[in-house]
Design a protein with these regions (language model features):
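Positively charged, low-complexity intrinsically disordered leader regions
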Residues: 1-27
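Structural motif
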Residues: 27, 105-106
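Histidine-anchored nucleotide/phosphate-binding helix
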Residues: 41-59
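Conserved mixed alpha/beta catalytic, RNA-binding, or beta-rich assembly cores of soluble enzyme
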Residues: 44-45, 106-107, 112-204
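Short internal beta-strands
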Residues: 59-67
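A glycine-rich helix N-cap at a beta->alpha junction
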Residues: 78-101, 105
């Protein structure tokens, strides 16, 4: 996928965030939550919360957009907007109403399932997960503001930008596009990379207060599962939490903060 993207996508995405935060009233919608059975995986929400906290520190007004059960889990601790599960007939109207209500300056999708050519949502195993999936695609399709898509597998919102490359893979790729696509081995890591760039631009080490394991425990306590093992563990896509901690430390060093 990386070869299909114009180099500099991390920097361009970070610049879109900076531009959106130019006013004190800046509103950033962050869509996340990939369903696994009747719950959600750790990859996505972890990075979404990190972006939420960073945007808040920079004076923005972030809003997490997700379906049940994730929306209900986060509602007590974060500003959230809940979207309906499997409501195919009303998903465009739902998006229009939300966009009219919130008037976002930027929309970010991180590890959100994207509609495929058949009009369904599928996981990396090719299983149809539409019945448990809320639709965030129309938020990006109808947006009058810039949009960022973050993903790692090819079936996430934003991957329509590289659909010609993905058709050669044995997956059901997403056809939903975005203004700037950011990819990483784990979507959460892309969020940390963007925060590192924002930190460098502002001269503030925002990753220093990023307690990844604490948020992972928080999500686990609400029933999250690893997207690979489908088990309630403190892991991200089958990888131990220490790997993310090491990545965050490396990003801080690269940014010149430690």
């Amino acid at each position: 996928m990386q070869a299909a993207l114009q180099p500099g996508y991390f920097l361009r995405a970070a610049q879109l965030i900076e531009q959106a935060l130019a006013t004190d009233t800046a509103r950033v919608l962050i869509g996340t939550g990939f369903p696994v059975g009747n719950t959600f995986e750790t990859d996505g929400p972890l990075g979404a919360i990190a972006l939420y906290q960073a945007i808040e520190k920079l004076g923005g007004n972030p809003l997490l957009v997700c379906g049940a059960p994730l929306a209900d889990c986060l509602a007590n601790d974060f500003a959230t907007h809940k979207i309906a599960l499997a409501d195919t007939a009303n998903r465009e109207q739902e998006a229009r109403q939300a966009l009219d209500q919130w008037q976002p300056d930027l929309i970010i999708s991180i590890e959100r399932p994207g509609l495929n050519a058949q009009g369904n949502y599928c996981n990396m195993r090719g299983e149809d997960i539409s019945a448990n999936c809320a639709s965030f695609d129309q938020f990006l399709n109808l947006a009058s503001c810039p949009t960022i898509g973050i993903g790692d597998g090819g079936n996430e919102i934003g991957m329509g930008n590289v659909i010609d490359t993905l058709t050669a893979l044995d997956i059901m790729p997403s056809t939903t596009c975005c203004d700037e696509l950011v990819i990483a081995d784990v979507s959460n890591w892309a969020a940390h990379g963007l925060i590192a760039l924002l930190s460098s631009a502002r001269g503030t080490d925002m990753l220093a207060s990023c307690d990844n394991i604490a948020v992972l425990r928080y999500l686990s306590g609400h029933g999250s599962v690893d997207g690979v093992s489908r088990e309630n563990t403190l892991t991200e896509d089958g990888l131990d939490s220490e790997i993310s901690e090491q990545l965050i430390d490396q990003l801080r060093k690269i940014s010149g903060f430690c």
